[in-house]
Regions:
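Aromatic-lined carbohydrate-binding/catalytic grooves of carbohydrate-active enzymes
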Residues: 66-100
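Aromatic- and acidic-residue-enriched segments that line the glycan-binding/catalytic groove
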Residues: 83-95, 125-157, 195-214, 328-332
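Active-site-adjacent "subsite" loops/lids of carbohydrate-active enzymes
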Residues: 23-53, 118-119, 124-181, 185, ...
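Catalytic domains of carbohydrate-active enzymes, especially glycoside hydrolases
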Residues: 54-80, 185-190, 272-276, 347-353
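Aromatic- and glycine-enriched glycan-recognition loops and surfaces
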Residues: 47-66, 91-113, 224-229
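Polysaccharide-binding and catalytic clefts of secreted carbohydrate-active enzymes
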Residues: 52, 69, 104, 146-270, ...
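Substrate-binding cleft of secreted/luminal carbohydrate-active enzymes
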Residues: 269-291, 298-353
Length: 353
């Protein structure tokens, strides 16, 4: 969807993807691509339905030609919705007079191109003060922002934006209702959440809820709140349509997930949390902190539940670039043009993936 889609396609064409694309999300070797809400802006903001549909058709035809089978479409990025929603305001990149449903168009065109669609949701991340003040009053998050008893508890500011606090059942219910709405209204193949859980380790974020809980271990308690929100979303999907998949795409390292209280080991080892884990292994083989081969092997050991599949997320945006935080592997992506090809080859031959 982005301006450099042609360049990206040319890059991906060298990655030895499967030659025979299939339309289901349960293939033995799933190959997918994420599209962010920011990617839509170029073809959505100020565009007519016909213009948007034509642009979507072009991009999905390119994606399908690569052998990619699944697209992960971000439908909620900042407490907004790129679909018709009772609970969330229209997407921030949608024009005020937008009269069509972006998700429905993308879903129709994807399925016609033989692509399965997973609706990608950020459940907790909200908006800045300026954006929150413009949010229509009919939506629950706007009402909570205006309520002094909810602002600072159910809805908490961290950095320059607001976040939902998963410690409250009303918050978890809103998020579950949003998932139910998606699965009820649209013939999607899956729902996915990514790596945004607790935005900070600062104890002030949820001090009141933690004090009320009577718990003594904040780290364990926060993990339990994340587990509750994940289970609520999983149950919302399965109770609405058991055939729809629910997946989680967490950070690529255990330490990164620990900082966000994301209990990835429980999710990979226990039924009832997700159908697949898709950790983001955006690393090269020479990365000092998280070398790709060892990190992939670590994840293969964590996902032991027979009901949970392990998929691996890799990146192409580092090709030809300096990997600033990679330590000894800082120049790997500049000196080796085959990093991604080697990663794919390793993954195809690794048990458990």
């Amino acid at each position: 969807f982005c301006k450099n889609i042609t360049e990206n396609v040319q890059t991906i064409q060298h990655l030895h993807l499967p030659e025979n694309p299939v339309s289901t999300a349960s293939t033995a070797f799933p190959c997918g691509m994420w599209f962010t809400a920011m990617d839509y802006a170029e073809i959505l903001t100020g565009k007519s339905e016909a213009e948007f549909r034509a642009a979507v058709q072009e991009r999905f035809q390119q994606v399908q030609a690569l052998g990619i089978q699944t697209v992960f479409l971000q439908v909620r990025a900042f407490a907004d919705a790129y679909y018709t929603s009772t609970y969330y305001m229209p997407g921030l990149s949608m024009s005020a007079d937008c009269s069509f449903d972006p998700l429905q168009i993308m879903l129709t065109e994807a399925h016609q191109s033989g692509l399965s669609v997973h609706a990608w949701v950020n459940p907790l991340r909200c908006q800045t003060d300026a954006q929150m003040e413009q949010m229509p009053e009919q939506y629950p998050i706007s009402q909570w922002y205006a309520d002094e008893t909810k602002r600072g508890t159910w809805l908490v500011k961290s950095g320059d934006r607001w976040w939902l606090n998963p410690a409250y059942p009303e918050v978890r219910q809103l998020i579950a209702d949003g998932v139910t709405e998606l699965v009820t209204q649209y013939e999607i193949d899956g729902v996915q959440i990514d790596d945004y859980f607790y935005p900070t380790t600062d104890a002030s974020f949820d001090a009141a809820a933690f004090a009320e809980s009577g718990a003594s271990d904040r780290s364990a308690w926060r993990k339990e709140q994340c587990n509750r929100i994940v289970q609520a979303m999983y149950n919302a999907v399965k109770q609405t349509n058991p055939k729809v998949l629910f997946g989680i795409s967490p950070q690529g390292t255990l330490s990164g997930n620990e900082k966000q209280s994301a209990d990835v080991q429980t999710w990979g080892q226990t039924a009832g949390y997700c159908d697949y884990l898709l950790p983001q292994l955006y690393f090269g083989f020479q990365n000092s902190t998280a070398p790709f081969a060892e990190t992939a092997a670590f994840w293969a050991e964590q996902v032991t539940c027979p009901d949970v599949s392990l998929w691996i997320g890799i990146c192409t945006y580092k090709i030809g670039q300096q990997d600033t935080w990679a330590g000894d592997g800082m120049t790997e992506w500049q000196t080796d043009s085959q990093v991604v090809s080697k990663e794919l080859e390793l993954l195809c031959n690794m048990d458990g993936i």
